[in-house]
Amino acid sequence: MVRTLGPPTWFLTFSCNDLNWLDMLKALLIADGRDIDDAEHLSFPERLNLVQKHPVVIARQFTLRVNALMRFLKRNKDCLGGPIEDFWYRVEFQNRGSPHLHMLVWCSNIPEFSTPEGIAVIERVVSCSLNPNDSTLRKLVEDLQIHKHTATCKKIAKMMVVALIFQDLQAIAPFV
């Protein structure tokens, strides 16, 4: 596609928040034969257990959300700065089974991003600020869009330090 269409206009990711989406939790409870009124009161271990127990429900619910996202993107021709000319996406599954999507989008009538017109498109489409007047949105952004270090991050950081030390040793004694 890149050979035919050129570089994509946008790279998007869409992650499944299977432990917190209320409709997802209700679908999981239905699959488990339980009352959906319990959805908001499930503990973290209970949510995790449901997610691990019903991967097909997770995949189907995620597909419904992806389809809704695609309908939104196609109907709202200016939400990405111009009409979608083409797209490609791939769904992958994280270690615990949660799906996420990586998407390339080609939009038509988008100026080069290095031009003043292109910068205006970026400023209109991309946001990295919090609206202080919308506490619900602020909480969502803080919970879902801000990176928090995990054990995996620390493990990777430790591996990087070991690699750097090894590189330094190689410079001192290349035969090691």
Q: Predicted regions: what is each one?
A:
Residues 1-101, 105-176:
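Intrinsic low-complexity, intrinsically disordered terminal tails and linker regions enriched
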